[in-house]
Amino acid sequence: ILRRKKKDVIKELPEKIETNIFIELGDEQKKIYVAELNKVKEAIEEALNDGGMSKVRFMILPLLTKLRQICIDPKIVYSDYTSGSNKIDRFLSVIEEVTNNGHKVLVFTSFRTALNLVKDKLDSIGIKSYQIDGSVSSKERQTRVDNFNNNDDVKVFLIMLKSGGTGLN
């Protein structure tokens, strides 16, 4: 297995350009977020009263994760949600702008459901993409990377953070 660390390939990478774009939640999305936040507060308060900090410690990460997912798109958590997401809409407009200017894009996420949602949206607007998540074999990962690098029609590569570097040479 070959593994390349950032320090080994940093000279080959283009200069990093970072742009922060702040996006307000849409009205429906905000309602869902606030309702979920109130549930989180109640659950933590109840757990503190029942079992103290030791009980709360195991609850916090899943609760915060759910809030993060709602900020991306409530559809990730609630499959029947249909009102859309300002964040996903803005993301898609950036992807369209970048790919229309002849560039390719790597997209990383921690959430497979977000990856699948974005893949579906890209497909619906005619932007070809490849995806790597835990379900893709090492051989297929390398094939997708090679195809992405050599096929100008494929503009976006969607990658799960946990599986992005695994099985790639």
Per-range role (PLM):
Residues K39-E46:
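Cytochrome P450 catalytic domain signature, combining two hallmark sequence patches
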Residues K11-V34, L48-L168:
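Conserved Helicase C-terminal RecA-like lobe
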Residues I1-V9, I17:
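Conserved P-loop NTPase motor "coupling/switch" region that bridges the ATPase
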